[in-house]
């Protein structure tokens, strides 16, 4: 469940900023998703992904890249992670690791050795990895899925086209265990594709219908 709070935080974050506190579903039978949240992340890509996955009864852990302190995103929305990435990786395996985009957030993901370790571990187990907008370049930086079909925000294409089979004409691309998408406006389909892979097409369609969204698996 996501709830919007109004609260003051240090470092210039005021009551005027929206704060989203993430509370994990406690259903132990659910599939598990890890969303890594870095400062400067694209908040639509984060929020829609977390919300849609939870609507699909997927257990979502939101891990702050550096710690579990509030994270200011690209448009000054402030998100309170469930935990830190360091702590999240001690909690067991995840069925999917999700990377939201955002230029500053993606730069932090690219420069984090911890993110690289998580992604390589996930890839070695054949687990799903999902990246949207700028975040596929973090996959490239950490050596994930080289040669596979992917997409991204169009501005990222020059950094990716020599390493991957780049797809221009699809909003969401899946190649094996790698799911990629293009930007804020494609996040619903991105999150529904993850939902489909974890809990089935029928659940994904039911979630989409409840949101008045049309999803075609």
Swiss-Prot record:
Q: Which parts of the sequence carry Cysteine sulfinic acid (-SO2H)? A: 133
Would you name any one GO CC term?
A: cytoplasm
Question: Phenotype on deletion?
Answer: Double knockouts for dj-1beta and dj-1alpha is viable but with reduced male fertility. Double knockouts for dj-1beta and dj-1alpha is more sensitive to chemical agents that induce oxidative stress. Double knockouts for dj-1beta and dj-1alpha shows reduced lifespan and decreased spontaneous movement over time. Double knockouts for dj-1beta and dj-1alpha spermatozoa are morphologically normal but immotile with abnormal vacuoles in the Nebenkern, abnormal mitochondria and aberrant separation of investment cones during sperm individualization.
Q: Tell me the GO molecular function terms.
A: peroxiredoxin activity; protein deglycase activity
Q: Which domain of life is it from?
A: Eukaryota
Give the GO terms filed under biological process for this record: dopamine metabolic process; glycolate biosynthetic process; glyoxal metabolic process; mitochondrial ATP synthesis coupled electron transport; neuron cellular homeostasis; positive regulation of mitochondrial electron transport, NADH to ubiquinone; positive regulation of phosphatidylinositol 3-kinase/protein kinase B signal transduction; regulation of mitochondrial membrane potential
Q: Where in the cell is it found?
A: Cytoplasm; Nucleus; Mitochondrion
Which tissues does the record link to its expression?
Expressed in testis (at protein level).
InterPro entries registered for this protein in UniProt = Class_I_gatase-like (IPR029062), DJ-1 (IPR006287), DJ-1/PfpI (IPR002818), Prot/Nucl_acid_deglycase (IPR050325)
| Family matches, as CDD domains | GATase1_DJ-1
Q: Name one Pfam family in it.
A: DJ-1_PfpI
Q: Which SUPFAM superfamilies match?
A: Class I glutamine amidotransferase-like (SSF52317)
Query: Catalytic residues per the record?
Result: 133 (nucleophile)
Q: Does the keyword Repeat apply?
A: no
* Keywords assigned by UniProt, alphabetized: Cytoplasm, Mitochondrion, Nucleus, Oxidation
* Job description of the protein: Plays an important role in cell protection against oxidative stress and cell death acting as oxidative stress sensor. Does not play a role in methylglyoxal detoxification.
PANTHER family per UniProt: PARKINSON DISEASE PROTEIN 7 HOMOLOG, PROTEIN/NUCLEIC ACID DEGLYCASE DJ-1-RELATED
Q: What is this protein called?
A: Protein DJ-1alpha
Q: Which organism is it from?
A: Drosophila melanogaster (Fruit fly)
